[in-house]
Curated annotation (Swiss-Prot):
UniProt-annotated binding residues for [4Fe-4S] cluster: C37, C38, C103, C132
InterPro entries reported in the protein's UniProt record: NADH_UbQ_OxRdtase-like_20kDa, NADH_UQ_OxRdtase_20Kd_su
Enzyme Commission number(s) from the entry: 7.1.1.-
HAMAP family: NDH1_NuoB
The protein, known as: NADH-quinone oxidoreductase subunit B
Family matches, as PROSITE patterns: COMPLEX1_20K
Membrane topology field: Peripheral membrane protein
Cofactor(s), by name: [4Fe-4S] cluster
Family: Belongs to the complex I 20 kDa subunit family.
Gene designation per UniProt: nuoB
Length: 220
């Protein structure tokens, strides 16, 4: 439009959306939610070598009401899932989630009844970070990609509609129908499957604590 040529030095032009998103991405406060070994790598990012303070993220919030980003670092059990959802619901908008590591992203090697097969069953995830555990450089790369995503987010009423379309109100659902049977017939079927697996392994019945200790003492 030629307006830039008529402005004096020291004046920049930008729209409100870009300014708001820039302030948001430069002051993202993470919520500490370390559950396993990935949390050690997340702590390393806060050290002087990687210096997450460069991005205004050195303050790991102990309360979800003063946090913008939840970094789920580790596996999430079914008993922990309601707590995770409650912490997420207490975070103010706008809020973002990074699933750090394969355990948080897809359950990892813990494919059983006790572990949620991906935190996206519980909360909406904005960034998936592979690795077991991922290195601190990978976490920094995911944070930079999240910053780029924040810069493109709308700040008007359209943002709420987009968040709903992306699953911002993710319901707390069981991670697997196989390991979380709902009715009696499904529970009976799961018990028969477990009994068949025990027979294949040579154990006719599940061992109790005393029986297991006796088996170990006998050298079996």
């Amino acid at each position: 439009m030629g307006l830039e040529e008529k402005l004096p030095n020291g004046i920049l032009l930008a729209n409100v959306e870009k300014l708001v998103n820039w302030t948001r991405k430069t002051s993202v406060w993470p919520a500490a939610f370390g559950l396993a070994c990935c949390a050690i790598e997340m702590m390393t990012v806060g050290g002087s070598r990687y210096d997450i303070a460069r991005f205004g993220m050195e303050r790991f919030s102990a309360t979800p009401r003063q946090a913008d980003l939840m970094v789920v670092a580790g596996r999430v059990t079914n008993k922990m899932a309601p707590v995770l959802r409650q912490v997420y619901d207490q975070m103010p908008e706008p809020r973002w989630v990074i699933a750090m590591g394969v355990c948080a992203s897809s359950g990892g090697m813990f494919n059983n009844y006790a572990v949620v097969q991906g935190v996206d069953h519980v909360v909406p995830v904005d960034m998936y970070l592979p690795g077991c555990p991922p290195r601190p450089e990978m976490l920094l790369d995911a944070i930079l990609k999240l910053h780029a995503k924040i810069m493109d987010e709308p700040i008007n009423a359209k943002r709420a509609a987009l968040r709903l379309e992306s699953g911002a109100r993710t319901e707390l659902v069981p991670s697997s129908e196989r390991y979380a049977p709902k009715n009696r017939s499904q529970r009976k079927l799961a018990e028969r499957q477990q009994a068949a697996q025990r027979r294949e392994m040579g154990a006719e019945k599940p061992l109790g604590a005393l029986e297991e200790r006796a088996e170990l003492n006998a050298g079996r």
